[in-house]
């Protein structure tokens, strides 16, 4: 066994029939494989789409709805039906399942993040399989493209998983679209997610799902930066989950960073909302970018926005305007403006423990989080 704690993300296209409705046969097959992995000693979390697919026909819709309010209503009905399918099938294998519905706020708010982490830890320690989904009935923003790709990466980072598996209807990341380009080549191992790789991903997904390959690259970036390797592979083949757990089926493996971001750094990079901007001189920029130093008041050039002690701000280099990163400040903007007027400004504005460096590509990639 190569992994002990695995997060599987199963998308809508991997759970539905041709008409967009939930396929009970596909759910049963997924739970069969989960049960075998569970018996082998793996700790498992399933991030599952499919609530809308499970519920829309019960409300009289002839096909999967497109309006947000109709999606929300369908998800409200379908979430219970979807969980019932998972619960019934897993109970036949004497395995307890548990439902957890999350929104972005559960990650952005530190207290709620801690509560979610503790609940998941207890469930895993007790041998249950948490089944996680976006709370689609209330979380409008989470109905955007790629929500559960992102969610699975956030969960994998939260529980410090050994592997995140993104199951989809294609068998990995290609150099081009394999359905239109016969010369497209699958990338089997990715050591670093570059801007070129992001450009390759492009595109959107199928009509039933909401996740394209670009959203999976975002998810892979978040997870690998947090120390979790990611495997993208097809769910269409027999024993897809079993083979993915061993990384033996065709797919694309994204290697984790050797030193994954700790929880505080993850929060700064992916969830903390910036309340202001600080511009620094070249010396301070070099200290932040290349030397791992704290930001001192003496390096400040200008301050804008409205922020207080412990708020998060974005820091830029004066002149070039290049983003340097984000951090939690030790002074509010009014105090900093007063310090800038001083002849000899002193003090630490952002300690290096409260700082995360960001490239322009990473900042753009996570702008929607």
From Swiss-Prot:
Question: Entry's Gene3D superfamilies?
Answer: Acetylglutamate kinase-like (3.40.1160.10), PUA domain (2.30.130.10)
Task: Provide the residue positions that the database annotates as binding substrate.
Answer: 49, 136, 148
Establish whether keyword Transcription is in the entry.
no
- Which Pfam families did the record assign? AA_kinase, PUA
Entry keywords, A to Z: Amino-acid biosynthesis, ATP-binding, Cytoplasm, Kinase, Nucleotide-binding, Proline biosynthesis, Transferase
Record EC number: 2.7.2.11
Q: Where does ATP bind?
A: 9, 168-169, 210-216
Q: In which pathway does it act?
A: Amino-acid biosynthesis; L-proline biosynthesis; L-glutamate 5-semialdehyde from L-glutamate: step 1/2
**Cellular location(s):** Cytoplasm
PANTHER family found in the cross-reference section:
GLUTAMATE 5-KINASE, ISOPENTENYL PHOSPHATE KINASE
| Stated family | Belongs to the glutamate 5-kinase family.
**Biological role stated in the UniProt entry:** Catalyzes the transfer of a phosphate group to glutamate to form L-glutamate 5-phosphate.
NCBIfam families from the entry?
Answer: proB
This chain's protein is named Glutamate 5-kinase
Species source reads Streptococcus gordonii (strain Challis / ATCC 35105 / BCRC 15272 / CH1 / DL1 / V288)
The organism's lineage is:
Bacteria, Bacillati, Bacillota, Bacilli, Lactobacillales
Encoding gene (name): proB
């Amino acid at each position: 066994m190569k992994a002990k704690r695995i997060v599987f993300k199963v998308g809508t296209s991997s759970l539905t029939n041709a008409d967009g409705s939930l396929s009970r046969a596909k759910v049963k097959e997924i739970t069969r494989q989960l049960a075998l992995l569970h018996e082998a000693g793996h700790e498992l979390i399933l991030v599952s789409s499919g609530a809308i697919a499970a519920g829309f026909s019960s409300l009289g819709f002839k096909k999967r709805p497109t309006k947000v309010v109709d999606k929300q209503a369908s998800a409200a009905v379908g979430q219970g039906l979807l969980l019932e399918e998972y619960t019934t099938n897993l109970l036949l294998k004497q395995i307890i399942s548990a439902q957890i519905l999350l929104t972005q706020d559960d990650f952005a708010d530190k207290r709620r993040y801690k509560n979610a982490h503790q609940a998941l830890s207890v469930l895993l320690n007790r041998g249950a399989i948490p089944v996680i989904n976006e709370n689609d009935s209330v979380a409008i923003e989470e109905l955007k493209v790629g929500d559960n790709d992102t969610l699975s990466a956030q969960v994998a980072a939260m529980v410090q998983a050994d592997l995140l598996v993104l199951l989809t209807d294609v068998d990995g990341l290609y150099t081009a679209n394999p359905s239109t380009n016969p010369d497209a080549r699958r990338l089997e191992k990715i050591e670093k997610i570059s801007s070129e790789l992001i450009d390759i991903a492009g595109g959107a997904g199928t009509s039933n799902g909401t996740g394209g390959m670009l959203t999976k690259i975002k998810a892979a970036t978040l997870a690998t930066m947090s120390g979790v390797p990611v495997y993208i592979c097809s769910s269409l083949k027999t024993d897809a989950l079993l083979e993915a757990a061993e990384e033996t089926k065709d797919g694309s493996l994204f290697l984790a960073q050797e030193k994954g971001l700790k929880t505080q750094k993850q929060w700064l990079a992916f969830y903390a909302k910036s309340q202001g901007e600080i511009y620094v001189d070249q010396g301070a920029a070099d200290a932040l970018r290349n030397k791992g130093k704290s930001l001192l008041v003496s390096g400040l050039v200008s301050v804008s926005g409205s922020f207080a002690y412990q708020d998060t701000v974005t820091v830029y280099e004066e002149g070039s305007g290049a983003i340097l990163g984000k951090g939690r400040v030790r002074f509010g903007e009014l105090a900093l403006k007063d310090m800038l007027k001083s002849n000899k400004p002193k003090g630490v504005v952002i300690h290096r423990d409260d700082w995360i460096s960001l490239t322009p590509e990473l900042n753009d990639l996570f702008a929607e989080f």
